[in-house]
Amino acid sequence: MERMFPPKKPSTMNSHDRPMCVQGDSGLVLTTDPKPRLRWTVELHERFVDAVTQLGGPDKATPKTIMRVMGVKGLTLYHLKSHLQKFRLGKQPHKEFNDHSIKDGMRASALELQRNTASSSAMIGRNMNEMQIEVQRRLHEQLEVQKHLQLRIEAQGKYMQSILEKAYQTLAGENMASAATNLKGIGPQTIPDMGIMKEFGSPLGFSFQDLDLYGGGGGDQLELQQNMEKPPLDGFMPMNHENLCLGKKRPNPYSGNNGKSPLMWSDDLRLQDLGSCLQDDPFKGDHHHQIQIAPPSLDRGTEMDPMSEIYDSKPEEKKFDASMKLERPSPRRAPLGERMSPMITTGTMAQGRSSPFG
């Protein structure tokens, strides 16, 4: 190799006068080492790659064919052979250039990857934050809705409770008002009922007395019946011996000058018959108990005797024994029709005799 380059070195050194580098007319750059070496520049490497490509690749290309295709003066087979071998092994002759390019590419790819990763991570983080914010917002809205519904339910319950309380109060007030009205209505209504009982008590009592008198029961049975009928009337109304009389008073045009009218029975004709029969009653003197009944009189203006004088027995007479009278069986009587017919006949005759109108 040294034999091939001796004439080239002095010419290069003479032309440039530089001991460090020698450059020929072909553009080759050689080192200034004791054994000069060819430096593959970028242009020279590009021409080598083009020649290899034209020849069909590094496997088909040979140093001779490459040297013929390149046509560079000063380029020997040694240079091409070593460079082709490195090229085939993938090692570029221009190491620094390749290292820088590789490093730059790796840096660029790393930066791009970092950028992509950062952007993707930023997007992912942003999306995650947005999703978390959206989830929190929806949860907050659901909580607000639940709270609102709870408030509405509580308000509805309070409203229903107030309505029920008002209804209870209204019903209680109505019940109290109706009860008070009933109490007010019951108070004055009892008095007329008592008056009605007082009015109808004596005529009903005397109807049974008339039957007893005309049936022959005697004064004892009449007194017993009167004593048994008196307690219910005494329980309903207070006894006033001065004002309570048999029957009720009616205005009488035939009364005297003292202004008091005699007792008028509800049935005048029947009571006149009763008085006439009592005057002629044969059983009047046979019993120990005497009953005083004053017949109505139109001529005198005196007042009727009170009930106490009529029904009370005389001091010298014996008191009535209710147990004795209840134990004694009553005599057998005739039917009611047979007893009423003589009563009506006798009453008609007595009326003809004692009627002031007739």
From Swiss-Prot:
Presence of the UniProt keyword Transcription regulation in the record: yes
Misc. comment: Roots of plants silencing IPN2 exhibit decreased rhizobial infection and nodule organogenesis under nitrogen limitation when inoculated with Mesorhizobium loti.
Protein's name in the database: Myb family transcription factor IPN2
Encoding gene, per UniProt annotation: IPN2
Region (Disordered) residue spans: 1-20, 310-358
LHEQLE, short sequence motif: residues: 139-144
Skewed-composition ranges (Basic and acidic residues): 311-330
Subunit comment: Interacts with NSP2.
Induction section of the entry: Induced in roots after inoculation with Mesorhizobium loti.
Main localization category: nucleus
Location relative to the cell: Nucleus
